[in-house]
């Protein structure tokens, strides 16, 4: 659901640079405490980038492809759920929302690239119980 993703948290605020706190999840705490998991996760990030799947340019091309598929449905969507309506208060049109998604992808991709470059894959402290 777009209003709870791509830098949105359901209240129409732009949260593009807020880091996701994996420490809030017991599962992620335990996984990230394992050096083998951190190593595999980092390797997967780099592999998917090298294959072009997670390259920023590829992600943006994918957004553009979805745009061309969805454009014909936009009028019906806004007829059903008008911009700045009672349950969704936002004046952005389809094009503005796509630009926000692309902006978010650029910011998040850079954050993740830095995160994985700086990730320690050596031993970590045991996950808290």
Spans of model-derived segments:
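Middle-to-C-terminal accessory/interaction subdomains
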Residues: 2-129
